[in-house]
């Protein structure tokens, strides 16, 4: 392409002061220019305590590490992931809203991991995707429990349970198994989680 010989591009150089600093600059620069995916912003943002907490939870929970897409904010039908980091970030933020304290990051991460792992036990399809016995795209297509809005709602439910019932919340989550989460159950989900 000889026509590219006359083109110019702007280049900005920054001194490399370490990986965290470079990632923060990436988050700052790209957040206001051509916006990166929300998940990529959450992945690299070093200032947002909630983003750091969401990353910590995903990285420390082997189950979620395998089913959360860290960079993209939308999932293709062929993606092996069930959730995006941005959806998991919003859900974990809802879960710990008013409960967590930034200076107790490790405790907050442990609480979130315990909660999300217990939630995962209520959805056999999640485990089947994790174990590669089901295709993630089909689960996302056929069930609403793998949608970001439901994940965030589960975070809000967890927030209420953790505030009101510190000892019996795991037992209460077992009720999730009794719900018909299929998209075909439009009588329940139409107008609530589906349009």
Each predicted region: which residue ranges?
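Accessory terminal alpha-helical modules
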Residues: 2-195
């Amino acid at each position: 392409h000889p026509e590219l010989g006359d083109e110019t591009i702007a280049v900005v150089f920054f001194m490399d002061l370490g990986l965290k600093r470079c990632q923060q600059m990436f988050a700052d620069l790209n957040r206001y220019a051509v916006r990166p995916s929300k998940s990529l912003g959450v992945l690299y943002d070093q200032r947002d305590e909630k983003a750091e907490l969401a990353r910590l939870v995903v990285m420390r929970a082997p189950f979620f590490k395998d089913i959360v897409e860290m960079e993209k904010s939308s999932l293709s039908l062929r993606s092996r992931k069930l959730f995006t980091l941005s959806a998991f970030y919003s859900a974990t933020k809802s879960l710990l809203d008013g409960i967590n304290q930034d200076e107790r990051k490790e405790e907050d991460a442990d609480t979130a991991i315990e909660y999300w792992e217990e939630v995962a036990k209520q959805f056999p399809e999640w485990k089947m995707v994790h174990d590669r016995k089901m295709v993630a795209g089909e689960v996302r297509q056929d069930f609403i429990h793998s949608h970001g809005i439901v994940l965030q709602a589960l975070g809000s439910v967890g927030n209420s349970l953790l505030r009101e019932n510190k000892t019996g919340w795991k037992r209460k989550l077992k009720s999730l198994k009794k719900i018909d989460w299929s998209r075909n159950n439009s009588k329940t989900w139409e107008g609530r989680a589906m349009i």
